[in-house]
């Protein structure tokens, strides 16, 4: 990065970072690692952006260990993303075994479907009997770890963290919430979040139904003066400039950083995204019960054509958990969820995270300082 050319917004001052680029807190499903792990988080922070750890579902000891690993790799600010599935219509008790949870909450036809899938692919289906670590109760315990470890930024990928904002602010931790529509953004504003990410339909992972270009300016207007970041379909300097023009103070970037050397994804996932184009993603509720964009695969296609109704969040994940872990154990990563945004078609090369960030920021600087002034003339 040319240190004489700095791209700076109010977000940089509020978070103590050089460039208005945040790594999306990309997590993983049971049996798969989280893409935004400590090495990637630290690399983005060290490059001048802000890395965010994807921590949903991590056991408390692993969460604490990963936060401390990040601290050992960088002295720059970073964040942690934990989903808060507070909007469940069915919330399994935290101390109930997974086997009993299934018996109590999951319809037989759904279980039969998963068992048939496992048989069709020749994967032994092993029941998991560990503690359910993706729950409301567990999320609250994770937040306590963040406060104890002095994490600068908490990110709510799902859910409205109204109950924790006062506690976070008292502990010196800022709060960021993601929204896929204006209604959700207003709920985050009411909860007094410090920042709101307006995430468009194009994004990978859990996403909504409104496109980024339509969503961002509406959220900016609705929640002013709360700072807004843009997400969804942003992968280079052009996307960064567009976000700023729409009124955002920065960007929340996931898919572009899947191409980082430090990203914790399997070789098969990396091959899939490298070969994919903009038409190769699908939105499905098969994995978690929430709409989630991923590279299309046979498991997703089978569920979406089965006629089965997706179950509420957590319950759907509980349904799929044994299959996910069994597929991972059998190294059938080609059948597992690969969250990816529509921007994937323009990203082909694996690079260090620093180069990805540098290219993005330098591209934006060139557009703002050189390209646009020669292409756009304002005459009186």
What are these regions (language model features)?
Residues 182, 201-202, 233-234, 256-257:
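Acidic, glycine-rich active-site loops and adjacent beta-strand->loop/helix elements
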Residues 1-223:
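Active-site entrance/lid segments in N-terminal catalytic domains of soluble metabolic enzymes
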Residues 40, 96, 100-111, 214-229, ...:
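Conserved active-site-proximal phosphate/metal-binding subdomains
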């Amino acid at each position: 990065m040319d240190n004489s050319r700095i791209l700076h917004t109010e977000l940089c001052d509020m978070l103590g970072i050089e460039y208005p680029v945040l790594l999306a807190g990309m997590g993983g499903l049971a049996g798969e690692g989280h893409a935004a792990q400590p090495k990637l988080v630290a690399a983005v922070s060290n490059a001048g952006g802000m890395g965010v750890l994807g921590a949903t579902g991590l056991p408390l000891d692993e969460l604490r260990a990963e936060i401390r690993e990040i601290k050992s790799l960088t002295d720059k600010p970073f964040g942690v993303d934990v989903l808060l599935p507070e909007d469940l219509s069915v919330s399994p008790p935290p101390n109930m075994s997974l086997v009993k949870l299934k018996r109590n909450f999951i319809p037989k036809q759904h279980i039969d479907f998963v068992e048939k899938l496992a048989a069709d692919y020749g994967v032994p289906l092993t029941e998991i009997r560990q503690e359910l670590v993706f729950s409301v109760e567990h999320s609250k315990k994770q937040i306590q770890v963040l406060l104890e470890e002095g994490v600068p930024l908490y990110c709510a990928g799902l859910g409205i963290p109204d109950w924790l904002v006062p506690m976070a602010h008292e502990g010196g931790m800022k709060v960021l919430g993601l929204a896929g529509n204006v209604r959700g953004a207003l709920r985050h504003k009411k909860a007094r979040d410090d920042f709101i990410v307006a995430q468009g339909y194009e994004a990978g992972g859990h996403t909504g139904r409104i496109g980024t270009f339509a969503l961002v300016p509406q959220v900016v207007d609705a929640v002013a003066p709360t700072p807004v970041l843009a997400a969804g379909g942003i992968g280079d300097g052009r996307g960064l400039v567009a976000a700023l023009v729409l009124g955002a103070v920065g960007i929340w970037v996931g898919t572009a950083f899947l191409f980082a050397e430090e990203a914790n994804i399997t070789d098969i996932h990396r091959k899939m995204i490298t070969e994919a184009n903009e038409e190769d993603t699908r939105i499905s509720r098969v994995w978690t019960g929430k709409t989630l964009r991923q590279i299309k695969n046979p498991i997703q296609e089978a569920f979406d054509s089965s006629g089965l109704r997706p179950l509420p969040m957590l319950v759907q994940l509980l349904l799929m958990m044994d299959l996910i872990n069994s597929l991972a154990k059998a190294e059938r990563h080609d059948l597992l969820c690969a969250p990816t945004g529509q921007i994937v078609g323009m990203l082909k090369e694996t690079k260090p995270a620093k180069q990805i960030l540098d290219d993005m920021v330098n591209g934006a600087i060139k557009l703002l300082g050189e390209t646009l002034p020669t292409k756009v003339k304002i005459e009186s």
